[in-house]
Amino acid sequence: MALISSKPLGTLIRVADSDGGEGAANYEIADINNFVSGGVVLVRKNIYSNSAFGSNTNYPNGTLDNLIKTTIYNKMPQQLRDKMMDVTFKLSGSGDITRKMFALTYTMAGFGNNSGVAEGKALQLYTSNASRVKTLNGSAASWWLSARGSSDYAWLVGADGSASSYGNYPSSTRGVVPAFAIPQSVMLEDSANTDGSYNIKYTEKISCTVNMGSIEEQPKAALPIISCNGNLTLKICNNANDANPAWETAANETVHNFANTTKTAAQWAIGLKIDITRTAGENLFLNEPVVLAMK
């Protein structure tokens, strides 16, 4: 596995964003720990669909904004939505907005300030017209930015990758290119897909229940010692031989005093319920647990 931030700009990341999560599309790594501190910005490699900009040239809560922040966002896998970062940026004529998914601004697309307003930061990938060219159904096509050009027109990226606003009325239909940011600690699968894209490696988990063995006398306290990495959640009981053990929340390497004083089985037994989840890029492991029983 590899950190997403270890991949070069332009690397393709496979994301399901259509057909209720069944369809697949590629997003390109456009920015690493630059516009979004600690984040990687992913931009759809090609155009999602065509849409109007809105009823006017202000992006917030218009047709394009609602399509991206609601419709497309809701088609993303829940595990990916959980990782998306809140991104705040300024828009000329609208001020600051915060979104988990958004259309690129004039500045993000590499065109500089929009009417004197820095609309976020230039994304590292977009340094030429060629880098901004996107296709719809295999043909290069224009796509909307979230930027106001004037009271009449909105900015877009033309089929050749250049910026254009004149004649682009908000009621016109142009391409939709969503973007979002996820933490740079997100992991990718080792093997690439046939088209060279990589799949995101979602949180893994180790879960197990361990009976540490029977004892004659009632254990009143115990010291669990768990050697592992990742985020550990631990439960313990002193009647693990019972059909329904009394599980109690415990802390690793901390003496636990049992609240339970009863059992239905012939003998007492200390049991552990161990759950470990990945926190970043670590390879999960769990060594054999140890428990010191106290009578």
Could you describe each region identified by the protein language model?
Residues 1-211, 226-227, 236-238, 273-278, ...:
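Collagenous Gly-X-Y triple-helix signature in extracellular proteins
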